Amino acid sequence: YDLGMNLTHLSLTTPINANWAMAVALRPYSMVDYKSSYTRQIVGAENQIVNFDNVNSGGVTRVSYVNSLRFFKDLYLGVEAAYNFGTIQKDSSSYLFGLQTNQLRNSTRYTLNGASLKLGLAYQHRLSDKWRINAGASTEISGNLKGDVLKTFGSYSDAGNGPVLVSIADTTLFSAINGTTPAQQRIGVSVESPFHWVFAADYHSTKWSNNQSIEKGLK
């Protein structure tokens, strides 16, 4: 008997009065989930290869507190304060001749946390009894991430039940790190007939050029 479940977005919204609402939300901000494998020939050994397996997992989760205010009947302003946190694990294993019995593994674990701020503005106007127009824009200010990185090197044995550490892994690096989340801007407009038709266009920009990666933020 197996039971599995994924939860990607959890939110709770409550109205304070006719012009003010608040919300809290928990959702993924960034996810890491991929594997890769490749082989290389051993120099000087004919038809002998070394295998490399890379496994990357984890991610950053965002918990948000949101306030939404209505002005002049058709104008809305939103403010989102968020806290980002999570762990990213990167494992790189190597073994000879395609046999996973004995493996050498480099492991890297990033633990991250930091705050960010997002502002939004929306306008809604009724064109007729059946049609209305909506326009909105939002900007997310680049936020800071800080935490630590732990790198280890160890020897593993695999008898068919999964890799088991042979001896205590060596710590090759433990250091504080910092980085940033990229600034983002969105703008969109739509014309709709409620519950019938929606015609929409939007633009989204993420500014990666000024973003500091966590690898460059080693202290």
Where are these regions (language model features)?
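Subset of outer-membrane beta-barrel
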Residues: 1-219
